[in-house]
């Protein structure tokens, strides 16, 4: 049986909030069977909980933000959510003492190492997957995203930026998902931004924590980071990282074939909502027989590195 997973112990880290520029303490806690992924703001009294849920995503302008019915929000959850998805974790409580998750280095890698440092523990209950049964597609102008039936989790993402530093032959990436491939090929890809956009955002009191330490920054001609890129195609890999985190807002790992062109947080969430709203398009599955598990989900996370 493929079992649910949580953390062996609690662990915490301190970082900077992307939008506030303020210090944020993040604590990750183990959680009982069937708890799911739950975000919590401990700076409020009483603390406010945000279970991972596609319908809780109500703002995708600059990041993925969860907003409850009272308008309370927690922002920038996508990179941590991607790390949780990548390692196949099912039950974790995430506490932050601020309105946003710390940005760290702009990738999912610091969260991966934090989770692995806490340790991953199997629980005595079957892990549930969402298996796609029918193709679902959403569009926004020339942008689109779709997911189709597939015995595993495969992703194909294409970006299209008219910029000298982003060549066309580095604008597409395909991944046959496994925890190991996620860690090695996707988790280190950092978020990116254009200098003109950062200057505008900071003039509006946003992205105050944004810097060359936590993002790839481009001017009109080149990448400004002294150390350059971690991968030649780091930008499209990061968009795939975002998509993995956005799709995991369902709270379950997905079995399906995801394809996207110029998609972002909003369209990814629209696709997930459209899938979940169509009862004929998906089903929950568990795997009692390990031999029948799709290959990408068969490798225990404990042996990743």
From Swiss-Prot:
Pathway: Glycolipid biosynthesis; lipid IV(A) biosynthesis; lipid IV(A) from (3R)-3-hydroxytetradecanoyl-[acyl-carrier-protein] and UDP-N-acetyl-alpha-D-glucosamine: step 2/6
One Pfam family this sequence matches: LpxC
Gene Ontology biological process terms in this record: lipid A biosynthetic process
Keywords in alphabetical order: Hydrolase, Lipid A biosynthesis, Lipid biosynthesis, Lipid metabolism, Metal-binding, Zinc
Enzyme class, spelled out: hydrolase
GO molecular function: metal ion binding; UDP-3-O-acyl-N-acetylglucosamine deacetylase activity
Reaction equation(s) it catalyzes: a UDP-3-O-[(3R)-3-hydroxyacyl]-N-acetyl-alpha-D-glucosamine + H2O = a UDP-3-O-[(3R)-3-hydroxyacyl]-alpha-D-glucosamine + acetate
Cofactor field: Zn(2+)
Amino acids binding Zn(2+): 79, 238, 242
EC id: 3.5.1.108
Positions of the catalytic residues: 265
GO cellular component: membrane
Purpose: Catalyzes the hydrolysis of UDP-3-O-myristoyl-N-acetylglucosamine to form UDP-3-O-myristoylglucosamine and acetate, the committed step in lipid A biosynthesis.
Family of the protein in this entry: Belongs to the LpxC family.
Protein name: UDP-3-O-acyl-N-acetylglucosamine deacetylase
Organism of provenance: Mannheimia succiniciproducens (strain KCTC 0769BP / MBEL55E)
């Amino acid at each position: 049986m493929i079992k649910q997973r949580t953390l062996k112990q609690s662990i915490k880290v301190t970082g900077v909030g992307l939008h506030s520029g303020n210090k944020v303490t993040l604590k990750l806690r183990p959680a009982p069977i069937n708890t799911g992924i739950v975000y919590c703001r401990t700076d409020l009294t009483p603390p406010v909980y945000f279970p991972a849920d596609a319908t809780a995503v109500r703002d995708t302008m600059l990041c993925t933000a969860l907003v409850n019915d009272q308008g309370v929000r927690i922002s920038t959850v996508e990179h941590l959510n991607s790390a949780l998805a990548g390692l196949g974790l099912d039950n974790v409580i995430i506490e932050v003492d601020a309105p946003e998750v710390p940005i760290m280095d702009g990738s999912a890698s610091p969260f991966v190492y934090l989770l692995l440092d806490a340790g991953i523990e199997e629980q005595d209950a079957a892990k549930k997957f969402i298996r796609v049964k029918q193709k679902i597609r959403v569009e926004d102008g020339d942008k689109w995203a779709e997911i189709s039936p597939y015995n595993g989790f495969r992703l194909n993402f294409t970006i299209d930026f008219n910029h000298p530093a982003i060549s066309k032959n580095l604008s597409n990436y395909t991944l046959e998902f496994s925890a190991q491939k996620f860690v090695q090929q996707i988790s280190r890809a950092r978020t990116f931004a254009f200098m003109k956009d950062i200057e505008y955002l900071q003039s509006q009191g946003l992205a105050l924590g944004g810097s060359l330490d936590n993002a790839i920054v481009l001017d009109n001609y080149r990448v400004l980071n002294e150390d350059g890129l971690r991968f030649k195609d780091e930008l499209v890999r990061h968009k795939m990282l975002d998509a993995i985190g956005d799709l995991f807002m369902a709270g379950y790992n997905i079995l399906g074939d995801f394809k996207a062109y110029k998609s972002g947080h909003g369209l990814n969430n629209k696709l997930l909502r459209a899938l979940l709203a169509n009862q004929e398009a998906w089903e929950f599955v568990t795997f009692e027989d390990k031999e029948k598990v799709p290959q990408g989900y068969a490798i225990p996370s404990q042996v990743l590195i």
